[in-house]
Protein backbone atom coordinates (compact mmCIF):
# COMPACT_ATOMS: atom_id res chain seq x y z
CA UNK A 1 0.00 0.00 0.00
CA UNK A 2 2.72 2.50 0.97
CA UNK A 3 4.84 2.12 -2.17
CA UNK A 4 2.32 4.12 -4.18
CA UNK A 5 2.09 6.96 -1.67
CA UNK A 6 4.17 10.11 -1.49
CA UNK A 7 5.40 10.08 2.08
CA UNK A 8 4.73 13.21 4.07
CA UNK A 9 1.99 14.32 1.71
CA UNK A 10 -1.77 14.07 2.00
CA UNK A 11 -4.19 14.56 4.87
CA UNK A 12 -4.16 10.96 6.11
CA UNK A 13 -3.22 9.36 9.41
CA UNK A 14 -0.44 6.85 8.77
CA UNK A 15 -0.88 5.45 12.29
CA UNK A 16 -4.52 4.46 11.67
CA UNK A 17 -4.89 1.68 9.08
CA UNK A 18 -8.40 0.91 7.84
CA UNK A 19 -9.61 -2.30 6.21
CA UNK A 20 -12.21 -2.31 3.40
CA UNK A 21 -13.27 -4.52 0.51
CA UNK A 22 -13.69 -3.79 -3.18
CA UNK A 23 -15.34 -6.42 -5.37
CA UNK A 24 -14.82 -9.01 -2.66
CA UNK A 25 -11.09 -8.37 -2.19
CA UNK A 26 -9.79 -6.88 1.06
CA UNK A 27 -7.52 -3.84 0.95
CA UNK A 28 -5.82 -1.63 3.52
CA UNK A 29 -6.13 2.14 3.56
CA UNK A 30 -5.53 4.94 6.04
CA UNK A 31 -7.85 7.07 8.10
CA UNK A 32 -8.53 10.14 5.96
CA UNK A 33 -8.47 8.25 2.65
CA UNK A 34 -11.35 8.20 0.23
CA UNK A 35 -12.14 4.90 -1.46
CA UNK A 36 -10.49 6.21 -4.63
CA UNK A 37 -7.26 7.31 -2.92
CA UNK A 38 -7.05 4.03 -1.00
CA UNK A 39 -7.51 1.99 -4.18
CA UNK A 40 -4.86 4.04 -5.97
CA UNK A 41 -2.52 3.53 -3.01
CA UNK A 42 -3.02 -0.21 -3.50
CA UNK A 43 -2.20 0.02 -7.21
CA UNK A 44 -5.84 -0.34 -8.32
CA UNK A 45 -6.71 2.01 -11.19
CA UNK A 46 -9.67 0.23 -12.80
CA UNK A 47 -12.77 1.25 -10.83
CA UNK A 48 -15.62 1.01 -13.31
CA UNK A 49 -16.87 0.67 -16.87
CA UNK A 50 -18.38 3.30 -19.15
CA UNK A 51 -22.15 3.27 -19.63
CA UNK A 52 -22.60 2.35 -23.30
CA UNK A 53 -19.41 0.73 -24.54
CA UNK A 54 -18.16 -0.65 -21.20
CA UNK A 55 -14.73 0.87 -21.69
CA UNK A 56 -12.39 0.71 -18.65
CA UNK A 57 -12.60 3.73 -16.39
CA UNK A 58 -10.66 5.03 -13.40
CA UNK A 59 -10.76 8.14 -11.24
CA UNK A 60 -9.97 11.40 -13.04
CA UNK A 61 -10.82 13.92 -10.30
CA UNK A 62 -10.53 14.24 -6.53
CA UNK A 63 -14.05 15.31 -5.59
CA UNK A 64 -17.76 15.39 -6.29
CA UNK A 65 -17.22 16.20 -9.97
CA UNK A 66 -15.95 12.64 -10.59
CA UNK A 67 -17.71 11.12 -13.66
CA UNK A 68 -16.13 7.66 -13.76
CA UNK A 69 -15.43 6.10 -10.36
CA UNK A 70 -19.03 5.37 -9.33
CA UNK A 71 -19.35 2.45 -6.93
CA UNK A 72 -21.87 0.69 -4.71
CA UNK A 73 -21.27 0.95 -0.95
CA UNK A 74 -22.64 -0.85 2.09
CA UNK A 75 -22.07 -1.05 5.83
CA UNK A 76 -22.61 -4.80 5.77
CA UNK A 77 -22.65 -7.54 3.15
CA UNK A 78 -23.68 -6.12 -0.22
CA UNK A 79 -26.31 -8.84 -0.53
CA UNK A 80 -28.15 -7.62 2.59
CA UNK A 81 -29.46 -4.70 0.55
CA UNK A 82 -30.73 -2.44 3.33
CA UNK A 83 -27.72 -0.16 3.65
CA UNK A 84 -26.59 -0.58 0.07
CA UNK A 85 -26.23 2.67 -1.87
CA UNK A 86 -25.42 2.69 -5.61
CA UNK A 87 -23.64 5.35 -7.66
CA UNK A 88 -21.48 6.66 -4.82
CA UNK A 89 -18.45 8.62 -5.97
CA UNK A 90 -15.31 6.83 -4.85
CA UNK A 91 -13.56 10.20 -4.72
CA UNK A 92 -16.05 11.45 -2.09
CA UNK A 93 -16.79 8.37 0.04
CA UNK A 94 -14.49 8.45 3.05
CA UNK A 95 -12.91 5.20 4.10
CA UNK A 96 -14.27 3.57 7.23
CA UNK A 97 -13.33 0.28 8.81
CA UNK A 98 -15.33 -2.60 7.35
CA UNK A 99 -16.67 -0.62 4.39
CA UNK A 100 -17.90 -2.93 1.63
CA UNK A 101 -17.79 -1.60 -1.94
CA UNK A 102 -18.37 -2.97 -5.41
CA UNK A 103 -17.83 -1.79 -8.97
CA UNK A 104 -20.78 -1.30 -11.31
CA UNK A 105 -21.87 -1.91 -14.90
CA UNK A 106 -19.89 -5.10 -15.48
CA UNK A 107 -20.50 -8.81 -15.93
CA UNK A 108 -19.21 -11.23 -14.82
CA UNK A 109 -16.46 -9.08 -13.25
CA UNK A 110 -14.70 -5.76 -13.68
CA UNK A 111 -11.52 -7.06 -15.29
CA UNK A 112 -13.34 -9.36 -17.74
CA UNK A 113 -16.54 -7.59 -18.73
CA UNK A 114 -18.50 -9.24 -21.50
CA UNK A 115 -20.28 -5.95 -22.11
CA UNK A 116 -17.01 -4.67 -23.59
CA UNK A 117 -18.03 -6.42 -26.82
CA UNK A 118 -20.05 -3.25 -27.44
CA UNK A 119 -16.78 -1.39 -27.88
CA UNK A 120 -15.74 -3.77 -30.65
CA UNK A 121 -19.10 -3.42 -32.38
CA UNK A 122 -19.42 0.33 -31.85
CA UNK A 123 -20.37 0.93 -35.50
CA UNK A 124 -23.63 -0.93 -34.87
CA UNK A 125 -24.54 1.23 -31.87
CA UNK A 126 -25.00 4.73 -33.21
CA UNK A 127 -26.99 7.25 -31.16
CA UNK A 128 -30.63 6.17 -30.89
CA UNK A 129 -30.03 2.90 -32.74
CA UNK A 130 -32.61 1.08 -30.61
CA UNK A 131 -35.42 3.28 -31.94
CA UNK A 132 -34.82 2.02 -35.48
CA UNK A 133 -33.44 -1.47 -34.95
CA UNK A 134 -35.91 -3.41 -32.81
CA UNK A 135 -38.95 -3.04 -35.05
CA UNK A 136 -39.51 -6.61 -36.16
CA UNK A 137 -41.04 -8.94 -35.29
CA UNK A 138 -43.47 -6.82 -33.30
CA UNK A 139 -44.23 -9.62 -30.85
CA UNK A 140 -40.58 -9.64 -29.69
CA UNK A 141 -40.75 -6.14 -28.19
CA UNK A 142 -42.37 -6.95 -24.83
CA UNK A 143 -40.71 -10.32 -24.26
CA UNK A 144 -37.25 -9.91 -25.77
CA UNK A 145 -36.16 -6.44 -26.85
CA UNK A 146 -37.51 -4.30 -24.01
CA UNK A 147 -36.24 -6.54 -21.15
CA UNK A 148 -32.75 -6.61 -22.69
CA UNK A 149 -32.64 -2.85 -23.24
CA UNK A 150 -33.92 -2.11 -19.74
CA UNK A 151 -31.39 -4.51 -18.25
CA UNK A 152 -28.58 -2.69 -20.02
CA UNK A 153 -29.72 0.77 -18.89
CA UNK A 154 -28.23 2.55 -15.91
CA UNK A 155 -25.04 1.92 -13.96
CA UNK A 156 -25.80 0.87 -10.39
CA UNK A 157 -28.45 -1.49 -9.15
CA UNK A 158 -31.24 -0.38 -6.86
CA UNK A 159 -31.34 -1.42 -3.17
CA UNK A 160 -33.62 -4.38 -2.54
CA UNK A 161 -34.58 -3.66 1.08
CA UNK A 162 -36.05 -0.65 2.93
CA UNK A 163 -33.49 1.90 4.07
CA UNK A 164 -32.91 1.34 7.83
CA UNK A 165 -31.31 4.76 8.33
CA UNK A 166 -33.28 7.83 9.33
CA UNK A 167 -32.87 11.42 8.23
CA UNK A 168 -33.50 14.85 9.72
CA UNK A 169 -34.48 18.21 8.28
CA UNK A 170 -34.58 21.68 9.76
CA UNK A 171 -34.51 25.40 9.00
CA UNK A 172 -31.38 27.40 9.72
CA UNK A 173 -31.43 31.18 10.06
CA UNK A 174 -28.30 33.16 9.25
CA UNK A 175 -27.33 36.60 7.96
CA UNK A 176 -24.57 35.43 5.63
CA UNK A 177 -24.15 32.00 4.03
CA UNK A 178 -20.78 31.27 2.41
CA UNK A 179 -20.50 28.14 0.28
CA UNK A 180 -16.95 26.90 -0.15
CA UNK A 181 -14.27 27.12 2.52
CA UNK A 182 -11.17 27.80 0.48
CA UNK A 183 -8.92 30.77 1.20
CA UNK A 184 -11.49 33.23 -0.21
CA UNK A 185 -14.41 31.66 1.65
CA UNK A 186 -12.54 31.61 4.95
CA UNK A 187 -11.46 35.25 4.58
CA UNK A 188 -15.00 36.31 3.63
CA UNK A 189 -16.50 34.48 6.61
CA UNK A 190 -14.07 36.10 9.02
CA UNK A 191 -14.68 39.58 7.61
CA UNK A 192 -18.46 39.13 7.80
CA UNK A 193 -18.28 37.83 11.37
CA UNK A 194 -16.11 40.75 12.46
CA UNK A 195 -18.79 43.11 11.15
CA UNK A 196 -21.29 41.56 13.57
CA UNK A 197 -23.17 39.29 11.14
CA UNK A 198 -24.36 35.79 11.95
CA UNK A 199 -22.28 33.70 9.52
CA UNK A 200 -22.53 30.12 8.27
CA UNK A 201 -19.60 28.63 6.33
CA UNK A 202 -20.19 25.32 4.54
CA UNK A 203 -17.94 23.02 2.52
CA UNK A 204 -18.42 19.57 1.03
CA UNK A 205 -15.12 18.19 2.27
CA UNK A 206 -14.25 16.70 5.68
CA UNK A 207 -11.84 19.59 6.29
CA UNK A 208 -12.04 23.23 5.38
CA UNK A 209 -9.28 24.78 3.32
CA UNK A 210 -10.17 23.98 -0.28
CA UNK A 211 -7.21 23.68 -2.66
CA UNK A 212 -4.82 24.77 0.11
CA UNK A 213 -5.12 21.29 1.61
CA UNK A 214 -3.43 19.77 -1.44
CA UNK A 215 -0.69 22.39 -1.74
CA UNK A 216 1.05 22.89 1.62
CA UNK A 217 3.93 24.72 -0.08
CA UNK A 218 1.71 27.78 -0.50
CA UNK A 219 2.21 30.51 2.08
CA UNK A 220 -0.36 33.07 3.25
CA UNK A 221 0.63 35.98 5.48
CA UNK A 222 4.05 34.37 5.86
CA UNK A 223 2.58 31.08 7.14
CA UNK A 224 2.45 27.65 5.51
CA UNK A 225 -1.04 27.02 4.13
CA UNK A 226 -1.95 24.31 6.66
CA UNK A 227 -0.86 26.47 9.60
CA UNK A 228 -2.83 29.41 8.21
CA UNK A 229 -5.98 27.27 7.90
CA UNK A 230 -5.71 26.07 11.50
CA UNK A 231 -5.20 29.63 12.75
CA UNK A 232 -8.21 30.89 10.78
CA UNK A 233 -10.40 28.04 12.03
CA UNK A 234 -9.61 29.08 15.60
CA UNK A 235 -10.51 32.68 14.78
CA UNK A 236 -13.76 31.65 13.08
CA UNK A 237 -14.84 29.55 16.05
CA UNK A 238 -13.97 32.35 18.45
CA UNK A 239 -16.07 34.73 16.33
CA UNK A 240 -19.06 32.38 16.54
CA UNK A 241 -19.09 31.36 12.86
CA UNK A 242 -21.17 28.23 12.23
CA UNK A 243 -18.87 25.72 10.46
CA UNK A 244 -20.48 22.89 8.50
CA UNK A 245 -18.22 20.31 6.85
CA UNK A 246 -19.41 17.47 4.59
CA UNK A 247 -22.17 19.82 3.47
CA UNK A 248 -23.33 20.32 -0.12
CA UNK A 249 -25.37 23.24 -1.39
CA UNK A 250 -27.92 21.58 -3.66
CA UNK A 251 -30.04 24.49 -4.88
CA UNK A 252 -30.72 28.22 -4.78
CA UNK A 253 -34.45 28.86 -4.83
CA UNK A 254 -37.00 31.67 -4.62
CA UNK A 255 -36.83 34.17 -1.76
CA UNK A 256 -33.13 33.47 -1.21
CA UNK A 257 -33.80 29.87 -0.21
CA UNK A 258 -30.69 27.68 -0.29
CA UNK A 259 -30.95 23.92 0.21
CA UNK A 260 -28.05 22.09 1.83
CA UNK A 261 -27.42 18.43 2.59
CA UNK A 262 -24.98 17.36 5.30
CA UNK A 263 -23.53 13.87 5.66
CA UNK A 264 -23.44 12.99 9.34
CA UNK A 265 -22.55 9.29 9.61
CA UNK A 266 -21.27 8.09 6.22
CA UNK A 267 -17.69 8.34 7.49
CA UNK A 268 -18.22 6.68 10.90
CA UNK A 269 -17.23 3.06 11.55
CA UNK A 270 -20.15 2.53 13.94
CA UNK A 271 -22.62 5.42 13.85
CA UNK A 272 -24.82 5.98 16.93
CA UNK A 273 -28.25 4.47 16.45
CA UNK A 274 -29.99 7.71 17.42
CA UNK A 275 -27.97 9.83 14.98
CA UNK A 276 -29.56 10.58 11.58
CA UNK A 277 -27.53 9.64 8.53
CA UNK A 278 -28.03 13.03 6.91
CA UNK A 279 -29.60 16.38 7.61
CA UNK A 280 -31.38 18.53 5.06
CA UNK A 281 -32.00 22.15 5.94
CA UNK A 282 -33.55 24.98 3.98
CA UNK A 283 -34.46 28.62 4.36
CA UNK A 284 -34.13 32.08 2.76
CA UNK A 285 -30.67 33.65 2.66
CA UNK A 286 -29.98 37.32 3.16
CA UNK A 287 -33.15 37.97 5.18
CA UNK A 288 -31.92 36.16 8.25
CA UNK A 289 -32.53 32.57 7.14
CA UNK A 290 -30.50 30.02 5.20
CA UNK A 291 -30.57 26.40 4.18
CA UNK A 292 -28.17 23.88 5.52
CA UNK A 293 -27.93 20.23 5.33
CA UNK A 294 -25.03 16.66 3.33
CA UNK A 295 -21.92 16.91 1.05
CA UNK A 296 -20.78 20.42 -0.23
CA UNK A 297 -18.99 21.96 -3.22
CA UNK A 298 -16.82 25.05 -3.13
CA UNK A 299 -18.26 28.16 -4.74
CA UNK A 300 -17.56 31.25 -2.67
CA UNK A 301 -20.43 33.72 -2.22
Regions found by a protein language model. Name each.
Residues 55-60, 97, 103-179, 226-301:
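FAD-binding core/adjacent interface of flavoenzyme oxidoreductases
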Residues 66, 217-221, 262:
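Short, hinge-like loop/turn segments at secondary-structure boundaries
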Residues 1-155, 163, 291:
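Signature of N-terminal electron-transfer/Fe-S-associated modules in redox systems
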Residues 34-35, 76, 184, 206-207, ...:
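Short, glycine-/Ser/Thr-/acidic-enriched flexible segments
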Residues 174-235, 239, 248:
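Beta1-alpha1 glycine-rich phosphate/pyrophosphate-binding loop at the start
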Residues 14-17, 30, 65-68, 172-173, ...:
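Short coil/turn connectors at secondary-structure junctions
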Amino acid sequence: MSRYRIMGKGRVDHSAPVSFTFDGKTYQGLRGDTVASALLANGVHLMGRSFKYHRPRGAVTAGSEEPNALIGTSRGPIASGGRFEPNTRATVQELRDGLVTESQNKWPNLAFDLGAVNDRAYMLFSAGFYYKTFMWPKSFWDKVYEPVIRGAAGLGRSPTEPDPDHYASRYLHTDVLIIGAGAAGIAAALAAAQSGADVTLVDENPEMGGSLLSDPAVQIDGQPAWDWIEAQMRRLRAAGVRLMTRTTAIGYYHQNMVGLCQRLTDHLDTPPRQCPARTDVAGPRGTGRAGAGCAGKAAGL
